[in-house]
């Protein structure tokens, strides 16, 4: 979308809460600005429940102003694309042609590489994790965990692996030095390897049999969903842990 937020109107009764002072007087936003705490969730709700109602999660998927349209065949894709264009036209929304990619078999979407078989991460992103130096402060560790948590849906038993690292964030202080234990050191190296080796996640093909593996300990629980393509090939569908 072109300046997506600015295409979302703010209710007249709420405009006063967006007021800001300038040398020329007090102004209020009539369209959604960047920076409001509730802007992302409001924009997502408007797009999913009003603009793309009946289409979202059926023929298209949306993350804020990034929209992806799908189709099993070229004809189906063009039909779905026409429906999306018609809906956006009806709602008065515009697209940025320079940022649009049409008819691609593989696209970069919300940090993932996505195609007809599934999704994965660029190898360069995974390789960079192995080079991450061990954090010396809680602030540095928190940043590291924020990065590896982005990959959690691709890592089996993620929560159990990082538990010793999360424990180091107790009594949080940005400058507090970390006292690394052997368990924490092992967890740090293990999560780096797990992220680096994280598998591609495949879409269900509606034909191959599926099976689930579960695991539990005193620290957490986990589940893994797979589909068996043949006697030698098993594909990962999803991982969950908490």
Mark where each language-model region is.
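Retroelement reverse transcriptase polymerase core
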Residues: 1-242
């Amino acid at each position: 979308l072109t300046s997506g937020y600015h295409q979302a109107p703010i209710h007249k009764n709420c405009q006063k809460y967006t007021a800001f002072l300038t040398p020329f007087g007090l102004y209020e936003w009539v369209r959604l600005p960047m920076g409001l705490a509730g802007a992302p969730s409001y924009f997502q709700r408007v797009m999913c429940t009003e603009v793309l109602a009946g289409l979202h999660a059926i023929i298209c998927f949306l993350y804020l102003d990034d929209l992806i349209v799908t189709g099993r065949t070229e004809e189906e894709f063009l039909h779905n694309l026409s429906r999306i264009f018609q809906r956006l036209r009806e709602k008065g929304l515009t697209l940025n042609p320079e940022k649009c990619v049409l008819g691609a078999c593989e696209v970069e979407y919300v940090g993932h590489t996505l195609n007809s078989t599934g999704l994965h991460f660029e190898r360069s992103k995974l390789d960079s994790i192995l080079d991450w130096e061990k954090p010396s402060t809680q602030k540095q560790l928190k940043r590291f965990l924020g990065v590896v948590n982005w990959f959690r849906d691709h890592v089996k038993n993620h929560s159990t692996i990082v538990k010793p690292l999360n424990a180091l964030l107790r009594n949080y202080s940005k400058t507090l030095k970390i006292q690394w234990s052997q368990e924490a050191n092992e967890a740090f190296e293990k999560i780096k390897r797990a992220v680096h080796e994280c598998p591609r996640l495949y879409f269900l093909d509606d034909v191959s049999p599926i099976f689930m593996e579960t695991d539990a300990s005193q620290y957490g629980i986990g589940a893994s969903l797979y589909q068996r393509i043949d006697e030698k090939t098993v594909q990962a569908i999803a991982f969950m842990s908490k």
